[in-house]
Amino acid sequence: MNDDNSTPLTVSVVMCTYNGEQFLREQMDSILAQDYPLHEIIVQDDRSTDDTWDILQTYAKAHPGLFKLFRNDEQLGFNRNFHTALLRATGEYVAISDQDDIWFPQKISKQVAAIGNADLCFSDYYTDLHYTLPLHNYVSPRTDFEHMLFYDCTPGHSMLLRTDFVKGIKLWNYDIYYDWWLSMHAQMGHGLVKVDEALNWHRHYDGSATTHVYRKGFYEAVPHPTWQPYAWGTLHRLHLQRKRNYRFFYTYLAQHIDRRKHPVPARIARLMLRHCPFAVLELCLICAKYYNRIYPGKPRGLKGRIRGFFYPLISAYGNDLFKLEK
């Protein structure tokens, strides 16, 4: 609520579509079933070739004034499409929606209640139809700045953000996942909060953008590694450091993280760019010292510190977060 406790804060929903006819109606119906009033539903279509656009027009006609539909003149890809669509939002907050998920009725109301003064709020989510699979398999329990420098654990489809925060980000690189970029800026700004409850069902299937990107991303990695990250993590790290988007990402963070406010994340960002063995050793020692902020698992004590020490190698092994680079 606003300061006068009478008018709900306005929330825009932003969805990007591409050939989403199979599940689009289910997601639209779940958005319309929210128990929180929506300011607008913005949908930006990336040149779909199926019936997606016709479905969108049907919903827009059934709900005059609520839907704002846009169709790109050329295909932008999901990263650029989401960024440009987010800039169209006019509500005080903006919620990001995939085209094929299902939102639970209290998703928006619970996130508006939780966000407080933070720039970003995200939540747990389910990925199975019966809502039974453990949530920790899909959202890391760690939301510390230090951990999120290694891992994108804030999925865009679960985000609610302050619109002025999104529009205040001046530099974007479309070879960096848009949701990771948003979460990093939130960490450098007024922070982020997490609702420890599943507020949507995220659908994984062969045609989804997420599934396509992740399949494209994995390289030289076994599905359930044991010793491999320790043996091959260094080589994978060197491979990542040669990628332009990797260097852009950590150079930007090294230059923009406030060293007085976030001394450890600032140091980690700088060390992620260095090649020499002493820099790797220093990074490993930092991760061992602050393992409770960095390592996503539950090990404590000596075991936790050992896992933390090797986390720079563990996180580099099979890392797919920089595979958008062409």
Which positions does each model-derived feature cover?
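Conserved nucleotide-sugar donor-binding catalytic segment
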Residues: 87, 141-220
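Glycine-rich, basic loop-to-helix element that forms the pyrophosphate-binding segment
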Residues: 72-89, 110
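Conserved donor NDP-sugar-binding/catalytic core segment of glycosyltransferases
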Residues: 106-135
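A conserved acidic beta->alpha catalytic loop
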Residues: 45-54, 74
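C-terminal subregions of glycosyltransferases and related glycan-biosynthesis enzymes
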Residues: 175-176, 181, 188, 192, ...
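Short aromatic/hydrophobic "clamp" motif used to bind/position activated sugar donors
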Residues: 94
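Cell-envelope/extracellular polymer assembly enzymes that use nucleotide-activated donors
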Residues: 9-12, 40, 181
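Short, well-formed alpha-helical segments that are part of the catalytic scaffolds
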Residues: 20-33
